[in-house]
């Protein structure tokens, strides 16, 4: 079965880079797929996206006119027609498996045919600065909840409930973990190395955050200080507030890191402070693009470099253009990417000999 996202890929490359290639830090490749049933309105919708680090590089949408796996970055456009034909065949096969799994899982959970249900899947691998394998992932979810996941040892499964144990027994009998491990430690790593080389100008860059602070009166006695970080890459960043040098984590409102729409990211952290005491508070920003951490303090003469109204309007527009399905898939990805167990439907690499990134085909649940 393949994993589904709350109501809302797979790639394999045959090229390999020499192990002498090194990068600044660790890197990851992730594929996320979501199938959503829609009773009375035709076949389930299937969306698959692939990420190298924080950059989406491929996408498939069964509702799109092209019905093809498509590049999402310029450096993927160098792949030839045979590559895209192979990836499209593989991702369509995965979509078909999910259609079957949706019916199977309804039976496992004794659900009626009338409601809409989802399957999500996330899989991928991480490499270290030397390009060598660090860890692999394979997770599945049903209706937004963990279903089954490949354990950190890549040899066994964790099932979330009695229904998932049925799938676990099937996959253990089929040797699914061994197939996944071979892909994750082999072709997944080779593909990631190749993408890092082909897209190095984008993937291996660091853009330092542009920072500023805004002040928003809450009442006659309190105000909100908001610390902004804009235009940074990669997405990993730390924003913290201190009062007189003491950490204010519990009193901090912190939003998830958000894509800016131009390949960079934005984030803010806010605290409510007594009016007139603003200068006791400092915001601390850490990011690999900075030579050293930044410390910001509100001054009465401070003016935001970007009007807050414009930023909020931009974020609203960004939310409007991103489809709900992909947003849900990404949210599920971030929630699960650092966990060794989640949900997932096993993929048997029927096409792995041909080097298809999507050849980690989902086994039926």
From Swiss-Prot:
Top-rank taxon, per record: Eukaryota
Residues spanning the membrane: 309-332
Residue intervals of the Ig-like C1-type domain: 209-297
A Gene Ontology molecular function term of the record: peptide antigen binding
Subunit relationships: Heterodimer of an alpha chain and a beta chain (beta-2-microglobulin).
Family: Belongs to the MHC class I family.
Name this protein carries in UniProt: Popy Class I histocompatibility antigen, A-1 alpha chain
Organism: Pongo pygmaeus
């Amino acid at each position: 079965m393949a994993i589904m996202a709350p109501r809302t890929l797979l790639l394999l490359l045959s090229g390999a880079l020499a192990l002498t290639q090194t990068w600044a830090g660790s890197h990851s490749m992730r594929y996320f797929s979501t199938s959503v049933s829609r009773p009375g309105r035709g076949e389930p919708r299937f969306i698959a996206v692939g990420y190298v680090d924080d950059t989406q590089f491929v996408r498939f949408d069964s509702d799109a006119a092209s019905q093809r796996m498509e590049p999402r970055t310029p450096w993927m456009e160098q792949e030839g027609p045979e590559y895209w034909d192979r990836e499209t065949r593989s991702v369509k096969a995965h979509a078909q498996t999910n259609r079957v799994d949706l019916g199977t899982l309804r039976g496992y959970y004794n659900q009626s045919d009338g409601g809409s249900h989802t399957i999500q899947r996330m899989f991928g691998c991480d490499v270290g600065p030397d390009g060598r394998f660090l860890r692999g992932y394979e997770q599945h979810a049903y209706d937004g909840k963990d279903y089954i996941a490949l354990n950190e040892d890549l040899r066994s499964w964790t099932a979330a409930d009695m229904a998932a144990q049925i799938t676990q027994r099937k996959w253990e009998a089929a040797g699914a973990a061994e197939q996944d491990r071979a892909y994750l430690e082999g072709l997944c790593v080779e593909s990631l190395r190749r993408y890092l080389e082909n897209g190095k100008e984008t993937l291996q860059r660091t853009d330092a955050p542009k920072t500023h602070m805004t002040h928003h009166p809450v009442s006659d006695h309190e105000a909100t200080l908001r610390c902004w970080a804009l235009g940074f890459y990669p997405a990993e960043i730390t924003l913290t507030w201190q009062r007189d040098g003491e950490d204010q984590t519990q009193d901090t409102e912190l939003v998830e890191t958000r894509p800016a729409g131009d390949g960079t990211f934005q984030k803010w952290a806010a605290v409510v402070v007594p009016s007139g005491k603003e200068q006791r508070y400092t915001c601390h920003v850490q990011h690999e693009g900075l030579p050293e951490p930044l410390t910001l303090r509100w001054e009465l003469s401070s003016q935001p470099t970007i009007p807050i109204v414009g930023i909020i309007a931009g974020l609203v527009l960004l939310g409007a253009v991103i489809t709900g399905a992909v947003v849900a898939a990404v949210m599920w990805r971030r929630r699960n990417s650092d966990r060794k167990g989640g949900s997932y439907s096993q993929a048997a690499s029927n096409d792995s000999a041909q080097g298809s990134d999507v050849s980690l085909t989902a086994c039926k649940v």
